[in-house]
From Swiss-Prot:
Family matches, as InterPro entries: AA-permease/SLC12A_dom, Amino_acid_permease_fungi, APC_YAT
Family: Belongs to the amino acid-polyamine-organocation (APC) superfamily. YAT (TC 2.A.3.10) family.
One GO process term, biological-process aspect: S-methylmethionine transport
Positions in the Cytoplasmic compartment: 1-77, 124-143, 204-215, 275-298, 378-402, 450-473, 527-583
Positions on the Extracellular side per record topology: 97-101, 165-182, 237-254, 320-356, 424-428, 495-505
Annotated protein name in UniProt: S-methylmethionine permease 1
Annotated organism of origin: Saccharomyces cerevisiae (strain ATCC 204508 / S288c) (Baker's yeast)
Length: 583
């Protein structure tokens, strides 16, 4: 973008930012409620003068930077979304299948994926603080790599959330059926569906408040388990047989054979457990302060250490990897396969007392994922549509900042949850998930690579690092390391899919885990054919747009806030500066 175009866009940003969105007319409660669903027209469209002078690409960038979301999310919301978003069935139940590969394999797998996740969140926070747009991952890829890459990543990531929604609704139903097996499971699907949609109809505040309290419940439950686990390892407990320590690391051992293949087998389970951590970056458009996003991202290190690594070590000490109950669960929500329940049941009566509590924890965890699916998918749909990558109708926003069309599309996918009454629902969801099986790794790679490209473009165009609102603690090297690590994780997953542990190779098994790769390639090629662009395979560093994508006034205010915070932290004692470095 040349100097004239940059100045023109800045004028539009400044002149339109002072205009306010039209308020709901009338004082009648019913009238206000009805009006809240009307389209939230952009201030630029109302003024129309300078906006009409922009090119189509500039209009898209302006619309992305000025989306009419309500900035209602506080620091406490973002922190709990970042923590609670990852505490789901992947941790409470899925950990069991990974433990069957051996406690050392489980620990190494979680350390590798955790290191990748740390890089991803830091890179994502840097980009989202700089360019706070809805559907940020896909749109950042379109800005820093190539529009076709961005479209492919965006569709794949969106599919992951849309397909997860009905699956988690089924999970809610199966979990509740533990207490009421005689009730038609479709009834529980309907209740979970209505509740999750209603919470999101209250906007970002409704989603965030519900996530806040559900996350507190999950965190308390996990802390209780950690404390009980430490006591049991030390030889305490009502029916203790003495000190356990690392007994099961020696017999039956630390690694299941074959070692490397079992290690690779833990990657997808670990990724599924960590998935959702990056969602805190999606909230940047609705956060009261950009600094809240950066603070939440910084805390990722401690969340990984406390909630995953410590838990994995305790589970590995309390449950032998050859326990048949680890892989005997009838579904991904079967608490009998939960290593938490197995660990406590190994002590005698405690296991029967805790099963109902653990089922409640799993129910909260599964419903929390349902809630997140509606929130994340609707924002992704709205962002992609605003960027011109989906039909314009999908960009519809009402006056309360709710992407109603995006929510409706997610709700339509949610109706697949009623397949719970079908005998073939397991097969259906297995192949639906195959559509986005390892999209975790491809999305995470893309986030890290975008940050690397952003830093390279800043250097190539002679920009100062002071212009970066929030700099990743790991710098560009964290992005490079994250890229390499995610490529290795994908290679490991392809290997174990082609030659699975304990069963012969088959095309069905391979595509169950790797179908997303050819689908992403097909979407990429299809978008490139649609664009009819075969000359430019990537955006050159000098051509990357570093200026648009944020409101000028908000950008300057955020820089001022950042500088004041730096001065405040530098005036504090050493212990506080260390604390703020990590948190």
């Amino acid at each position: 973008m040349d100097e004239f175009e940059s100045t023109k866009l800045s004028k539009v940003q400044f002149s339109t930012s002072v205009l306010s969105t039209p308020s709901n007319e009338g004082n009648n409660l019913i009238h206000r409620f009805k009006n809240s669903f009307k389209r939230n027209d952009s201030p630029a469209i109302q003024e129309g003068l300078l906006y009409s002078e922009l090119s189509e690409e500039e209009k898209i960038q302006w619309d992305l930077a000025n989306q009419p979301y309500k900035k209602v999310l506080d620091q406490r919301h973002l922190t709990m979304i970042a923590i609670g978003g990852t505490l789901g069935t992947g941790l409470f139940i899925g950990l069991g299948e990974s433990l069957a590969s051996g406690p050392a394999s489980l620990l190494i797998g979680f350390l590798l994926v955790g290191a990748s996740m740390l890089c991803v969140v830091q890179c994502g926070a840097e980009l989202s603080c700089q360019y706070p747009v809805s559907g940020s991952y896909a749109l950042h890829a379109s800005r820093f790599i190539d529009p076709s890459v961005g479209f492919s990543i965006g569709i794949n990531y969106l599919l992951m959330w849309l397909i997860s929604y009905p699956s988690e609704l089924v999970g809610c139903s199966l979990t509740i059926s533990y207490w009421a097996p005689s009730v038609n499971p479709a009834a529980w699907v309907a209740i979970a569906f209505v509740l999750s949609m209603l919470l999101n109809l209250f906007g970002a505040r409704g989603f965030a408040e519900s996530e806040f309290y559900m996350s507190i419940f999950k965190i308390v439950a996990l802390f209780i388990f950690i404390i009980i686990g430490i006591v049991l390892i030390a030889g305490g407990g009502p029916d203790s047989t003495g000190y356990i320590g690392t007994k099961y690391w020696h017999d039956p051992g630390s690694f299941a054979v074959p070692v490397f293949k079992n290690l690779c087998n833990t990657f997808v389970s670990a990724a599924y457990s960590f998935s959702g951590t990056e969602m805190v970056v999606l909230t940047s458009t609705e956060a009261r302060s950009v600094s809240s996003v950066s603070r939440a991202a910084k805390g990722t290190f401690w969340r990984i250490i406390i909630f995953y690594i410590v838990t994995v070590i305790i589970i590995g000490c309390l449950v032998p990897y050859n326990d048949p109950r680890l892989i005997s669960g009838s579904s991904s929500e079967d608490i009998t396969a939960s290593p938490f329940v197995i660990a406590l049941s190994n002590t005698g009566a405690m296991g029967t007392r805790v099963s109902h509590f653990m089922n409640a924890v799993i129910l909260i965890a599964v419903f929390s994922v349902c809630n997140s699916c509606v929130y994340a998918s609707s924002r992704l749909i709205q962002g992609l549509a605003t960027a011109g990558q989906l039909p314009k109708i999908c960009a519809y926003m009402d006056r309360n900042g709710r992407p109603l069309v995006g929510m409706a599309i997610c709700g339509a996918f949610g109706l697949l949850g009623f397949l719970v009454v079908s005998k073939n629902q397991g097969t259906v969801f297995t192949w639906l998930f195959a559509l986005c099986s390892i999209s975790f790794f491809t999305t995470w790679f893309c986030i890290c690579f975008c940050q690397v490209r952003f830093r390279m473009a800043m250097k190539a165009q002679g920009r100062s690092k002071d212009d970066i609102i929030y700099r990743s603690t790991l710098g560009i090297y964290g992005g490079i390391f994250g890229c390499i690590l995610n490529v290795l994780l994908v290679i490991g997953e392809i290997y174990v899919s082609a030659a699975p542990v304990g069963s012969p190779s088959s095309a069905a098994n391979f595509f169950e885990y790797c179908m997303s790769i050819p689908i992403m390639i097909a979407v990429y090629i299809g978008h490139r054919i649609y664009r009819r662009d075969w000359r430019h395979w990537y955006i050159k560093r000098m051509d990357i747009d570093l200026d648009s994508g944020h409101s000028l006034e908000d950008f300057e205010a955020t820089k001022l806030e950042r500088d004041e915070d730096k001065k405040y932290v530098s005036s504090k004692p050493l212990y506080y500066r260390i604390y703020r470095f990590f948190c």
